Amino acid sequence: MAIIVEHDKRRKQILDNALIVFMDEGFVNATFQKIADQCGIARTILYLYFKNKKEIFNYSIKQLLLNVEENINSVRSDKSLNSEEKITKVLLTIFKLLEQNRQLLSVVLDYLVHLSKEGVSPEDRVRRRTVKLRHILSSMFIEGVKNGELKKMKVKAADDYLYSFIEAAIFQLVVTKRKNLSELRETAIFAIKQLSL
């Protein structure tokens, strides 16, 4: 049992250190050797845990998204908030996490461009990584409609509406290099109020 725990602990440490390398170097310039050096281990040891840098990158992003989902689920389960407040708080929490991980977002964009050049659809990768987040947004909307707190509309339309704020946030931070999302925060708050009864 201790061996499994140690293996999982080492794997998590590798992922944490790999994120640092990806943020410093970008996806294309990050190498297995640089990740091993950051971890303080030999490259051959790194191969015991991961087969290549793409696998490390995917697991690193997955780990980050799990942390995001934990934050969001804690808001979602807060009984003291109504549906409008929950959705607003979730979007604002996501905005804050995106601002804190601006550099990582640039690496993700770099990775998606790299995939596209390899002939792999970035859209499929993004959809797979964001399906849980979209599900959480949809379920909060459905709950709000059932509770009589939000206007009725098609769930997919509501999901797309809410998710578009996240896409706008990423675009503003990575492509237009905005320093913060203060204007988008105000717009999102206003827009979510329009969903309320």
Residue ranges of predicted features:
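An amphipathic alpha-helix adjacent to DNA-recognition modules
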Residues: 8-16, 28-29, 49-73, 88, ...
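Short secondary-structure transition hinges
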Residues: 96-138
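Hydrophobic alpha-helical connector segments
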Residues: 59, 73-102, 158-162, 185
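Helix-turn-helix
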Residues: 2, 13, 21-55, 59
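Hydrophobic/aromatic-rich alpha-helical bundle segments in the mid-to-C-terminal region
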Residues: 103-110, 123, 127, 145-191
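N-terminal intrinsically disordered/low-complexity leader segments
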Residues: 1-9
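Amphipathic alpha-helical packing segments from all-alpha helical-bundle domains
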Residues: 69, 73, 120-147, 157-160
